[in-house]
């Protein structure tokens, strides 16, 4: 059974990293429901913070389905941007500007290049949709940053 099995997935893609549709395509054929997908420009938003509208969607879907049923997938091109997004959906908006300011959801959050995601989806589809980006992204730094945020703030240790 996959970590993603039966979960509601919120996808926050990055124009310069992994776009939302690529992650959504990878999730086809496994037992998940993509409830929201967006592709943003992380560099374009204030200090790389998560878009305020996306924060609102994350908050609303978490209220609707329960934090235990939500997984957030990010596709940020840089470890720092991925970490800010992960921190926002776990510990609250670090910029204190959006709907998640001071809201500690503790959600499960993964980057598309992490082994937890890669191992849960069809490898051929992953290679077709995301594999090329692994060559240009600093995968090790992204994984390290995401693990650190989850260790500090995620409420679910599965």
Curated annotation (Swiss-Prot):
Report the active site residues: 44
Question: Cellular component per GO?
Answer: glycine reductase complex
GO MF terms here are:
betaine reductase activity; glycine reductase activity; sarcosine reductase activity
**Tell me, what's a Pfam family for it?**
GRDA
Q: Does the keyword NAD apply?
A: no
Q: Which UniProt keywords apply?
A: Oxidoreductase, Selenocysteine
Give me the reactions it catalyses: acetyl phosphate + [thioredoxin]-disulfide + NH4(+) + H2O = [thioredoxin]-dithiol + glycine + phosphate + H(+); acetyl phosphate + methylamine + [thioredoxin]-disulfide + H2O = sarcosine + [thioredoxin]-dithiol + phosphate + H(+); acetyl phosphate + trimethylamine + [thioredoxin]-disulfide + H2O = glycine betaine + [thioredoxin]-dithiol + phosphate + H(+)
Describe the protein's quaternary organization and the partners it interacts with. Monomer. Component of the glycine, sarcosine and betaine reductase complexes, together with components B and C.
> What does the similarity note say?
Belongs to the GrdA family.
Q: What is this protein called?
A: Glycine/sarcosine/betaine reductase complex component A
């Amino acid at each position: 059974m996959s970590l993603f099995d039966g979960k509601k997935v919120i996808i926050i893609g990055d124009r310069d990293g992994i776009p939302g549709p690529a992650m959504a395509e990878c999730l086809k054929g496994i037992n998940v429901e993509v409830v929201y997908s967006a592709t943003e420009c992380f560099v374009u938003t204030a200090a790389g913070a998560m878009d305020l509208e996306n924060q609102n969607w994350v908050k609303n879907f978490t209220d609707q389905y329960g934090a235990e049923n939500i997984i957030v997938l990010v596709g940020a091109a840089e470890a720092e941007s991925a970490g800010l997004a992960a921190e926002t959906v776990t510990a609250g908006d670090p910029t204190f500007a959006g709907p998640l300011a001071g809201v500690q959801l503790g959600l499960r959050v993964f980057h598309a290049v992490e082994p937890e995601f890669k191992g849960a989806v069809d490898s051929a589809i992953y290679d077709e949709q995301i594999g090329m980006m692994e060559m240009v992204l600093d995968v090790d730094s992204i994984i390290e940053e995401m693990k650190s945020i989850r260790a500090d703030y995620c409420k679910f240790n599965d």
